[in-house]
């Protein structure tokens, strides 16, 4: 058995010297040290040895096992080191070659305008509130004075997840959640993504950004609403910006209005963009409906408020004269590099 052990050691060491791949080294380990390996087989037969031979052969077998394990590890490290050196040589950088200029990214115009809008309102004392994009039907509709089967629901093509969950069609639900959590005075904006089941075209997208605002306190009037939004428009588009309000209808405000601004293309002269009117719709607004306040346990006899909402994508299009909303979602560097 001593001769067998010495022969196994000699054969294993000889095979290790000839191998050039890590996979071959592993096959040698399995051949000699694996569960069915040659050395393992001999160790299992030691019970047939005499008591005198057993400790001598056992020590020799363990020494050979240790020597083989060390040799296998050294061979594996040698091969890995050789492969690493070859790889490094193949990846050598020729410092005389001209460098490749990296394309520098730019802030997306949608992000720029959204940040500008938030900064304007924060400077006016508004806080920023956030809410879930997957919203309860109650917060998206019912709490906003739009009960089930109300005709106003037909104006918003809604993505329903089930009977009680929707992808929010507006950020107004955040106003309800804020009024439930906070007592007046409240002065907040809620920017974020909203979803409508619209076909994609130059002016419509199933996903777009919206910003809504809410002010609730004692003695709030339409004059406060008008002054706030006119100040926002001047800060956003310049002091020369002219605005006007015209009556409209929203279920969650009474009275309601839409604010128009002078056309950015023709400066109020009339063109194709403004359909010859000289004005472009900017946002919707109004005094918070008393029922909406009641739904949030706020007494409309004590408190009043105003709310407004605007599409951020629309603001970008107006500010930069973009005529197709799809340009903002196609990641075309030729378009983005213009801003």
From Swiss-Prot:
A single GO BP: phenylalanyl-tRNA aminoacylation
EC number: 6.1.1.20
Gene3D superfamilies: Bira Bifunctional Protein, Domain 2
Short name of any one Pfam family annotated for the protein: tRNA-synt_2d
GO cellular component, one term: cytoplasm
Protein keywords: Aminoacyl-tRNA synthetase, ATP-binding, Cytoplasm, Ligase, Magnesium, Metal-binding, Nucleotide-binding, Protein biosynthesis
Subcellular location: Cytoplasm
UniProt KW Magnesium keyword: yes
Domain of life (superkingdom): Bacteria
Catalytic activity: tRNA(Phe) + L-phenylalanine + ATP = L-phenylalanyl-tRNA(Phe) + AMP + diphosphate + H(+)
Alphabetical list of InterPro entries matching this protein: aa-tRNA-synth_II, aa-tRNA-synth_II/BPL/LPL, Phe-tRNA-synth_IIc_asu, Phe-tRNA_ligase_II_N, Phe_tRNA_ligase_alpha1_bac, Phenylalanyl-tRNA_Synthase, tRNA-bd_arm
Family matches, as SUPFAM superfamilies: Class II aaRS and biotin synthetases, tRNA-binding arm
Cofactor(s) the protein needs: Mg(2+)
Cofactor details (free text): Binds 2 magnesium ions per tetramer.
Annotated GO MF terms: ATP binding; catalytic activity, acting on a protein; magnesium ion binding; phenylalanine-tRNA ligase activity; transferase activity; tRNA binding
Binding-site residues, Mg(2+): 254
Matching HAMAP family: Phe_tRNA_synth_alpha1 (MF_00281)
Similarity annotation: Belongs to the class-II aminoacyl-tRNA synthetase family. Phe-tRNA synthetase alpha subunit type 1 subfamily.
Subunit organization: Tetramer of two alpha and two beta subunits.
PANTHER family: PHENYLALANINE--TRNA LIGASE, MITOCHONDRIAL, PHENYLALANYL-TRNA SYNTHETASE
NCBIfam families: pheS (TIGR00468)
Protein name: Phenylalanine--tRNA ligase alpha subunit
Native species: Clostridium kluyveri (strain ATCC 8527 / DSM 555 / NBRC 12016 / NCIMB 10680 / K1)
Lineage: Bacteria, Bacillati, Bacillota, Clostridia, Eubacteriales
